Amino acid sequence: MQYKDENGVNEPSRRRLLKGIGALALAGSCPVAHAQKTQSAPGTLSPDARNEKQPFYGEHQAGILTPQQAAMMLVAFDVLASDKADLERLFRLLTQRFAFLTQGGAAPETPNPRLPPLDSGILGGYIAPDNLTITLSVGHSLFDERFGLAPQMPKKLQKMTRFPNDSLDAALCHGDVLLQICANTQDTVIHALRDIIKHTPDLLSVRWKREGFISDHVSRSKGKETPINLLGFKDGTANPDSQNDKLMQKVVWVTADQQEPAWTIGGSYQAVRLIQFRVEFWDRTPLKEQQTIFGRDKQTGAPLGMQHEHDVPDYASDPEGKVIALDSHIRLANPRTAESESSLMLRRGYSYSLGVTNSGQLDMGLLFVCYQHDLEKGFLTVQKRLNGEALEEYVKPIGGGYFFSLPGVKDANDYLGSALLRV
């Protein structure tokens, strides 16, 4: 006797019987299966994670010091606003949408079915906050002649120029504004983007977009675990403590003593780099060489010659680089000197995977994002130290830009960029 399987293919009854026996045997070999039913399986969210939310109003925007969520998107836009009043309308509208999307609520009902639906519907009838943050930053080009904002441009904001190892694609660089959208799940990120685009058809045009991720279990650790990049190394071990308010005032936020325009206080310089990895080449590189290039043990993340990930390397006792090479990534990025302390920055990077290149290689890498109170002392100084590092053979920056993340929204009567546009 024969039966048809789920694909409509005839299957002998004996084979079906063996499948059933195998399934029972497998179930019998897992005595803890019932005990695990109440727990979240790896890669899934706990039942209440969709209701997790970040405060929207405050001195600073969320999404900068916020522990990294699992899903992320960078979207750069060209602004279509015709004048300063139109730009204010855009920023007010973005503030309204961000406030709703990040706090959650019922999806709007469409009163007339002959009209387009008011919501994409991809989250269902209730839009859960899902730990969503949307961080708005402005680029150098927003301060051109269109809106009369040139005198108010942040002092260190500039157009990203090419470093020696860069292979920049103009279609993936710069932007009048940049949104960093992060949430526990990717569908929430996509829903937020579509909502924003739907509400701003005459004000914004997408320039470029990239989506990123970190491991779900790393995200759920709320900063206690370090993300691992697609080269297999921990990424962000030496980050300053984002929960230390005094340190963040020194490292991340623009303050009143910096001689910046007054409206920038509470904001932060944002550097974004889209970095493609040559993963096939890297995977054929000996482990010892990989570790020498980074200066860390690949499995533990510890500096070479040390035991634990967060051990502080002692470069003074290794002046010739016999343990940690002089051109290793960690030694160049942070030499641990009194002078280099001023170049600290808060990294918030994500991995990306985007199909294959035209040459048939895997297109994957890092969406590097960092925040600092001074772009020149922070990212630009660090990147100049990294020029010529051994890692350059395996990585290729292809896009990004420099932006300024606006200060936060005080309350429901305020809006993003209000201090800038009221000058």
From Swiss-Prot:
PROSITE patterns: DYP_PEROXIDASE (PS51404), TAT (PS51318). Residues 1-35 form the signal peptide. It comes from the Bacteria. It catalyses: heme b + 2 H(+) = protoporphyrin IX + Fe(2+). One of its GO terms (cellular component) is cytosol. Involved in the recovery of exogenous heme iron. Extracts iron from heme while preserving the protoporphyrin ring intact. Homodimer. Part of a ferrous iron transporter composed of EfeU, EfeO and EfeB. This is Deferrochelatase.
